[in-house]
Structures are given as C-alpha cells and as structure tokens.
C-alpha cells in the first residue's frame, strides 16, 4: 500500500518511513552524508519512527560540521517529545549554539 500511496501522492506510511530510514543508514555507511541527512530528515518529518532517526541525524550533523541544520531538528524534537528526558538534547543545543 505504501507504494500505491507514494504513486498516487498519498501520505507516506510507517513502512515508507522505515524504508527511508534503512536507505539513510546505507547511505551513511557508504559515506554519502548529504543523501543520508536528507533521508533522515524525511523520516523525522514523517514522524512514525519516533525518536529513532534523531540520534543518527544529530550525530552526522555534528561529525560533518552541518551545525546549521541542528536548531530546527532540536525544535522538532522538543515539540514532539516534550516529556522525554531532554538532558542529552540540552547538551546538543548548547554545543550547537557554541558552534554557530
């Protein structure tokens, strides 16, 4: 059904989100950082995989000096998961501010 949804312009399914995540992981392993970041971002925007895509996205941004992408990611994380333990995201936010 995910294929039909994407074919006819419907909303992506949870299957699509997992497929995007797997593709991002493969691109990361190959060293295609831009492609990996784009697909992690798709998964984050999709929302069905919860916290799962945030960590690799943030790690890649930090490792490859893509600091300008992190403020939006942090904002989305805080909005979606306001009750989560945010100690780690606080540290990332502080480091991002220092880098920018």
Describe these PLM feature segments.
Residues 18, 52, 86-88:
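Start-of-helix register in tetratricopeptide repeats
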Residues 16, 23, 56-57:
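Structural register within alpha-helical repeat arrays
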